[in-house]
Amino acid sequence: MRIIVADCCAEYTGRLSASLPLAKRVLLIKADNSLLIFSEIGSYKPLNWMLSPCTIKDITPQDADDDPATPTPEKIIRVQSTKTNDVLEVTLQHIYSDETHDLGTDPGLRKDGVEDHLQRYLAEQIERIGEGAKLVRREYPTAIGPVDIMAIDADGTHVAIEIKRHGGIDGVEQLTRYCELLNRDPLLAPVRGIFAAQTITPQAQVLAKDRGFDCLLLDYDDMKGTDDGALRLF
């Protein structure tokens, strides 16, 4: 990762045109040649950027110096997209710092409480959907994708469970498609559905009820064993 702190201005040309006036900013240049320009204030998003695949070229103008008072810039960085004619040209009028660091291989972001965790905990504690319930399997395969959990309730009825962190109408529609498909299989039918999530929107609750599904609110801390909160089935 190359990190440059500089007084700079920038021009983006191609499918759109944009410019940044001269100001002190931070430039990040990644190993894939992506370039991102950040300022001190504003959102987490860069002010301007060029993403990979692209080529990058450092240009040192003739008579370049590090005096910010002179009109000649220290360096120009030109980034060209390899798929389009888009070009981002950054003029570095004065460079305060230009350093390169090898960050190594990143293990990636590990999220806590996301759908995979919820699925695993609910599979391990399947009686939370009802006393006497038994797990068939996680990621139950179908022709249109895997159902998060397939179970059998105390009455011997198959139960398809769709799990979301935040449950909305799209999740209910997804569960509907699964149940419609599964109910065509005489070895499984009847299959009822449960829509499970940490939060469920009122609209999703109404739609789920209309489709004949139960809604299950998941308390992640309780399932993890760090709280005494209760799940609610309604």
UniProtKB/Swiss-Prot annotation:
Keywords: Cytoplasm, DNA-binding, Endonuclease, Hydrolase, Nuclease. Gene3D superfamilies: 2.70.180.20, 3.40.1350.10. It holds the Pfam family NucS_N. Its main location: cytoplasm. The keyword Disulfide bond does not apply. One of its GO terms (cellular component) is cytoplasm. It is an enzyme of class 3 (hydrolase). One of its GO terms (molecular function) is single-stranded DNA endodeoxyribonuclease activity. Cleaves both 3' and 5' ssDNA extremities of branched DNA structures. This is Endonuclease NucS. It comes from Bifidobacterium animalis subsp. lactis (strain AD011). The gene is nucS.
